[in-house]
């Protein structure tokens, strides 16, 4: 019994490689007789290949099936039997000559329908690709929107948490005091000096009012008020020194 692998190897070597080499020699030498011979062989072998494919699926279980295949290929190639030339001249050539016009029409229709089918498949493929791209874009946009929404809700939660903590530390609604720009080094010293000046002026006015209202005070009290007036701080405006006018001293 011959296995299927051995049959395939024999058909490959003697049915394809050997005829292909002889066809090359016929084309190179421009021998018309050999050229026609091998062209008839390839036509018959093409029909054999189609028949073999169908037979392998249906009658490969038949006894001596692979041996019959090898014998048929050898019969086609043998220069004594010339099986390929016999089959072509007796069967294939008359059949193809009678059906040539119909076969040509079928080939033209197949080309046109095949072209239209390919165009339709191409359009459908483009439409499917466009729909898939749009669907993917919409889904990605929805995912991005949900992500941004989750981020915004998280930020609002953080802000509410900060307000809760601030309310916890300042229950009366008082916010944490912040140092303003005006409380820097230069402005704070000027503000402090002006506060001292206003205090001295107020002391001066109050002391004078006390002097004029209470005439029966002792001399020591009047001297104390005069010392307060004399000890007033001088106000500076830039590089100039402002000296307040001295009031006449009152003695009792």
From Swiss-Prot:
It is a multi-pass membrane protein. Residues 163-225 are annotated as: Disordered. Pfam families: TB2_DP1_HVA22. InterPro entries: TB2_DP1_HVA22 (IPR004345). Residues 198-211 have a biased composition (Acidic residues). The chain crosses the membrane at residues 1-21, 35-55, 57-77. It is found in: Endoplasmic reticulum membrane. The keyword Transmembrane helix applies. GO terms for molecular function: microtubule binding. GO terms for biological process: cell division; endoplasmic reticulum tubular network organization; mitotic nuclear membrane reassembly; nuclear envelope organization. Keywords: Cell cycle, Cell division, Endoplasmic reticulum, Membrane, Microtubule, Mitosis, Transmembrane, Transmembrane helix. The keyword Membrane applies. Its main location: endoplasmic reticulum. One of its GO terms (cellular component) is endoplasmic reticulum membrane. It comes from the Eukaryota. Microtubule-binding protein required to ensure proper cell division and nuclear envelope reassembly by sequestering the endoplasmic reticulum away from chromosomes during mitosis. Probably acts by clearing the endoplasmic reticulum membrane from metaphase chromosomes. Belongs to the DP1 family. This is Receptor expression-enhancing protein 3-B. It comes from Xenopus laevis.
């Amino acid at each position: 019994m011959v296995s299927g692998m051995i049959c395939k190897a024999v058909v490959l070597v003697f049915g394809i490689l050997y005829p292909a080499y002889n066809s090359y020699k016929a084309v190179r030498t421009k021998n018309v007789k050999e050229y026609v011979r091998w062209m008839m062989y390839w036509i018959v072998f093409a029909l054999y290949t189609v028949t073999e494919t169908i037979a392998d699926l249906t009658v490969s279980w038949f006894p001596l099936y692979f041996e019959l295949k090898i014998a048929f290929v050898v019969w086609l190639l043998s220069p004594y039997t010339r099986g390929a030339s016999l089959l072509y001249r007796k069967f294939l050539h008359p059949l193809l000559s009678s059906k040539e016009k119909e076969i040509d029409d079928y080939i033209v229709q197949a080309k046109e329908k095949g072209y239209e089918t390919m165009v339709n498949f191409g359009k459908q493929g483009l439409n499917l690709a466009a729909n898939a791209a749009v669907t993917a874009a919409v889904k990605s946009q929805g995912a991005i929107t949900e992500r941004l929404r989750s981020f915004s809700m998280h930020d609002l939660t953080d802000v509410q948490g900060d307000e809760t903590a601030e309310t916890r530390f300042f229950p009366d609604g008082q916010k944490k005091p912040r140092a303003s720009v005006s409380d820097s080094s230069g402005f704070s010293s000027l503000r402090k000096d002006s506060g001292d000046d206003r205090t001295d002026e107020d002391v001066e006015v109050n002391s004078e009012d006390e002097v004029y209202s209470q005439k029966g005070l002792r001399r020591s009290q009047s001297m104390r008020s005069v010392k307060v007036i004399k000890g007033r701080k001088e106000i500076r405006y830039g590089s100039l020194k402002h000296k307040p006018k001295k009031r006449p001293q009152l003695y009792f």
